From Swiss-Prot:
UniProt GO molecular function: phosphatidylglycerol-prolipoprotein diacylglyceryl transferase activity
Lineage: Bacteria, Bacillati, Bacillota, Bacilli, Lactobacillales
Pathway(s) where this gene product acts: Protein modification; lipoprotein biosynthesis (diacylglyceryl transfer)
UniProt xrefs under HAMAP family: Lgt
Stored InterPro entries: Lgt
GO CC annotation, single: plasma membrane
Transmembrane segments: 20-40, 54-74, 94-114, 175-195, 205-225, 235-255
Highest taxon of the lineage: Bacteria
Enzyme Commission numbers on file: 2.5.1.145
Protein name, entry field: Phosphatidylglycerol--prolipoprotein diacylglyceryl transferase
Signal peptide extent: none
């Protein structure tokens, strides 16, 4: 049956401590990052990388990744933020882009790898499982903020009531595209964790290549269903970037097998 109480949406604030408001969005982001660090620290010794290097990398990459996510979003919504500059830093209300975070994180990773004399593909292979998991969790922050949704649908009877309630936006039920992407990235995480030490012949960078192809494909499909995509003219920016990710992932995978040394 249809949800009889669509107004029972979740509060964006999880906990209020006097003037300090702790948002669900922040909890999912920080929680995902913490799990990603834990996973990377467990894997690092197997690649002869110190856990201290992982911690140091995260201390640089995490804050700059958040800045990158926000900056990317603001750039493509400049028509709004140019008129409301005070809202530029209000990320607690939502408004971050995963691709912006990935771009910033990649820059930090390559610079960090150079100065610590760590092969960047080793560091990427170590961190990718955590990135998958953090992305899967982060989409639930979008869920609470009522972001990353799709077209209007007549009902969502196939979903639990708490999701139906939150997907009732502006008087209509919306397709929960956040959920599709969360499931897609969680599936990628499970596949990597199950097979990365079971498949013989994996080369340095293969896990990273898999991430680029898998996430690029998932994001391309999901982005096509969203109605709040960041646009550049008539084009969905994230779909173009998704195609680029798939191409780079395939090229890297093939190149690593053609390279003799």
């Amino acid at each position: 049956m249809n949800n009889l109480f669509p107004f029972l949406a979740l509060n964006k604030i999880a906990l209020q401590l006097g003037p300090l408001a702790i948002h669900w969005y922040a909890i999912f982001i920080v929680g995902g990052a913490a799990l990603a660090v834990w996973l990377a620290c467990k894997e690092a010794p197997k690649r002869n990388i110190k856990t201290d290097d992982i911690i140091d990398f995260v201390l640089f990459a995490f804050p700059l990744g958040i800045v990158g996510a926000r900056l990317y979003y603001v750039i493509f919504q400049w028509s709004y933020y140019s008129q409301h500059p005070s809202q530029i830093i209000a990320m607690w209300d939502g408004g971050g882009a995963i691709y912006g975070s990935l771009i910033a994180g990649a820059i930090v990773l390559f610079v960090f790898s150079y100065y610590r004399m760590i092969h960047p593909l080793d560091l990427l292979d170590i961190t990718i499982p955590g990135v998958f998991l953090a992305q899967a969790m982060g989409r639930w922050g979008n869920f609470v903020n009522q972001e990353a949704y799709g077209k209007i649908v007549s009902n969502l009877d196939w979903l639990p009531a708490f999701i139906r309630n939150q997907m009732f936006i502006d008087g209509h039920y919306r397709m929960p595209t956040f959920l599709f992407e969360s499931i897609g990235t969680l599936s990628g995480f499970i596949l990597v964790m199950v097979f990365r030490h079971r498949i013989k012949g994996l080369k340095r960078g293969d896990i990273f290549s898999f991430y680029l192809v898998w996430y690029g494909a998932v994001r391309f499909i999901v982005e096509g269903m969203r109605t709040d995509s960041l646009m550049l003219g008539p084009a969905r920016v994230s779909q173009w970037l998704s195609v680029l990710l798939v191409i780079v992932g395939l090229v890297l995978f093939i190149y690593r097998r053609m390279k003799k040394n």
